[in-house]
Every structure is written in C-alpha cells, then in structure tokens.
C-alpha cells in the first residue's frame, strides 16, 4: 500500500484509462479488400489497415501500394473511412483503362506504407498512432492484387 494520504484522487480515476494512454496505437494487420482488379473496367483499389485500438483520423492520410512491375505506377490510396474504430479504409478510384496500372501488374504492400500527408491518426489517449509496420510480415500477409486486362 501507499501511505501517502495527500495523493490526488483524480490519479486513481485516471488509472482506468491507463492502458490506452501508455503507448501509441500500432498497425496489427493490413489487407487488400479484393485480390484482383480489371483495368478495362476500372474500379476501386481498397486497403484495410487495422490497429490494436480505435484511432481518430483528421485530414487525408495516404497508403502507398507498390507496383512490382514499375515504381512509376505505384498507387496512392487516400483515407476514406473508419475514424473512431480500429479499422481504416484507404481507397484509390481508378478509371477504366487508366495508365496507372497495366495487365499483369502485381500490386503489393511494403514496409511503412502509411503517410500522414499533413493529417493525423491518433489513439484514444491522443497519442499519434504509429504508422510504422512492426514487421515485414504484416505487409506480406496482406497478399497482392493482380491486375487483369
């Protein structure tokens, strides 16, 4: 026990929130919403990013998807939704026949794909969430997206 009778009572109340205030939210999982994309039809390239606790987003953070074929055709997905939850969605809308991808391109996730882009991603304790993937395995587990003609 603590014999300090002058301890501030508010400290005891704050202990209930301690778990969410000690460390920043971390990315725990990343995945493609679909694993195939038809260039002739166009459509959305969506990424799901899961954190170990709910996060709040301001602005438009971005997610970089690399193109195995050519870095000049990497895809940048903008934040779409999920603030207040532990799952954020990033999206790139691609018009039919768009030159950003070619048939047989393989899109994949590499280390540290999230950039704040002048926005913020914060946990419930107001800590800036980590945008660093804690392991290359997180990106590898996301799989790939193959572009069709």
Locations of the language-model features?
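Non-catalytic beta-sheet/beta-sandwich ligand-binding modules that flank or precede catalytic cores
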Residues: 1-149
């Amino acid at each position: 026990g603590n014999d300090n009778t002058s301890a501030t009572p508010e400290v005891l109340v704050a202990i209930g929130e301690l778990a969410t205030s000690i460390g920043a939210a971390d990315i725990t999982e990343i995945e493609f919403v679909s694993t195939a994309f038809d260039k002739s039809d166009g459509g959305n390239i969506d990424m799901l990013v899961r954190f170990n606790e709910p996060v709040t987003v301001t602005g438009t953070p971005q997610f970089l998807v690399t193109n195995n074929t050519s870095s000049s055709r990497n895809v940048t997905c903008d934040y779409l939704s999920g603030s207040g939850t532990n799952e954020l969605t990033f999206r790139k809308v691609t018009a039919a026949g768009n030159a950003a991808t070619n048939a047989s391109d393989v899109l994949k996730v590499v280390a540290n794909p999230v950039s704040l882009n002048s926005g913020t991603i914060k946990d419930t304790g107001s800590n800036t969430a980590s945008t660093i993937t804690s392991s290359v395995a997180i990106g590898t587990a996301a799989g790939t997206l193959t572009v069709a003609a």
